[in-house]
Amino acid sequence: MCGIVGFIGEQDAKEILLKGLEKLEYRGYDSAGIAVQAENGVVVYKEKGRIAKLREIVDENVAASVGIGHTRWATHGVPSKVNAHPHQSTSKRFTLVHNGVIENYELVKKEYLQDVTFVSETDTEVIVQLMEQQVSTGLSVEEAFRNTLSLLHGSYAIGLLDAENPNMIYVAKNKSPLLVGVGDNFNVVASDAMAMLQVTDQFIELMDKEIVIVTKESITIKNLQGETIERAPFTAELDASDIEKGTYPHFMLKEIDEQPLVIRNIIQKYQDENGEIELNQDIRNAILDSDRIYIIACGTSYHAGLVGKQFIEKFAKMPVEVHVASEFSYNMPLLTERPFFIYISQSGETADSRAVLVQTNEMGHKALTITNVPGSTLSREADYTLPLYAGPEIAVASTKAYTAQLAVLSILAADIAKAKGEVLDFDLTHELGLVANAMIELCDQKEEMDALAKQFLATTRNCFFIGRSVDFYVGLEGALKLKEISYIQAEGFAGGELKHGTIALIENGTPVIALATQEHVNLGIRGNVKEVVARGANPCIISMKGLEMEGDSFVLPTVHEALAPLVAVIPLQLISYYAALHRECDVDKPRNLAKSVTVE
């Protein structure tokens, strides 16, 4: 959700900034802009829409080796050129980009900036105007920056240019991700490392309420008290090819195809030298010392948590609750005496989940983060981390991170079960290997998936997914994928709930996708299909081999029933992908959505 880049050195800043913003497109945005320190002052370029439009207006003849850039996802003010970043103070001395939400911006305007004429509707403009007001009182730029930040309540990642000090960038963060990259006679700023892999793989993590002064030769980190902090850089373990589509038309299709490799990678990472599942002893002990597990997540990660609940309760016989993070923060349930929290987040930056983690940390409860970004905020602030090892996921709609979450949750459940003396009736590592094989088989059946999408979804306005037991949870994820990228109104329901209201929406031709992978509820879901067919529905039944019946639309290769969700979701991902193509939707960057949701 939004992205920041900055560059200071001797090279052409404009092109580096534009390329950096292109690498941040996956985070979601509705407008973009850059500002560069040119010979005659700061020059700002910004546009509503795609970065390609921004490129068209950037003057190639303007020489600049210092600049900042931004992709905006609207929170305050409509998507527009005026509301796009960078924003400038009235005198144009200060130019600023900002990710996050300033919660008290209206109070700041009223108390400090009554005489200022604002150009935009954004909370961000308040910061840059406040900066100018603070300098006007006689403070140095650094003192004014520190004072400005002390008056703000909320989240921010900030890059600031000062026209009177053109050889530096001022940077600060609080509750919003930001890195500083280290180069040879240059330095960079970025919301995440992928943006600046083009020039460096050395980055320094910034902590909340730190101020950084960046020049081409130095990086000076200070706290709000002005004390200097030393911190060594880390090497970003990313390959530039990981964030390229290669021969694929879309990142989403590439990431769907990468899932078998991801599962095998997870097996390898979580095996000991004897090929046995082995997790950190401290994680195991903390969970065993608890009396209930609480899984906190949003969106796709929440759906993974629902399946994870099944894994843990069935394998390890421990009670689990799953909560939507945004609801948990404001309506915390009664907790048991010894709760253990699991936070699931692809990015590790999800603001709603972090808000809960802050609360539970203050209460003294242990927490584990399951994330694709081990150095992320959630990872740093939780007690333990289990990485997904899925590699960068660029498409906004999550695919490989979801199945990676399921695989890691199954491994966690099996490890706890083993520690408790619970015996599984199958070898998890072997069965996960079979899951990877089944995924390969499914990914090779794209023509069949395309045909199903064309038959059931190409022209429909709505669609329902039904399932029982764990298939219900997979159906929720299938519905989310479809609505995210094809803009079809799609909903997932428990099969048994149809007659309690939803069946009123069924009419002639309504597509209903039914999942049948669980033997103990197979007859039940078949009965639900008959109910909707009797009302005119157009059923698409996806069943597991051995449970199939005449008329099923697609039969999945056999895997262990407990791990069926990892396989059953693949056709749903592919059907959603092809439905979006048939409807000429932007698959990788669907409207109004952001990959990393860093504001509450």
Curated annotation (Swiss-Prot):
PROSITE patterns per the UniProt record, alphabetical: GATASE_TYPE_2 (PS51278), SIS (PS51464)
Keyword terms, alphabetized: Aminotransferase, Cytoplasm, Glutamine amidotransferase, Repeat, Transferase
InterPro entries according to UniProt: GATase_2_dom, GFAT, GFAT_N, GlmS/AgaS_SIS, GlmS/FrlB_SIS, Ntn_hydrolases_N, SIS_dom, SIS_dom_sf
Location(s), subcellular: Cytoplasm
Residues at the active site: 2, 595
One example of a Gene Ontology biological process annotation: fructose 6-phosphate metabolic process
Enzyme Commission number: 2.6.1.16
Gene3D superfamilies the record matches: Glucose-6-phosphate isomerase like protein, domain 1 (3.40.50.10490), Glutamine Phosphoribosylpyrophosphate, subunit 1, domain 1 (3.60.20.10)
GO cellular component, one term: cytosol
GO molecular function: carbohydrate derivative binding; glutamine-fructose-6-phosphate transaminase (isomerizing) activity
Domain SIS: 283-422, 452-590
Subunit relationships: Homodimer.
Cited function: Catalyzes the first step in hexosamine metabolism, converting fructose-6P into glucosamine-6P using glutamine as a nitrogen source.
Name of this chain's protein: Glutamine--fructose-6-phosphate aminotransferase [isomerizing]
Naturally occurring in which organism (per UniProt): Bacillus cereus (strain ATCC 14579 / DSM 31 / CCUG 7414 / JCM 2152 / NBRC 15305 / NCIMB 9373 / NCTC 2599 / NRRL B-3711)
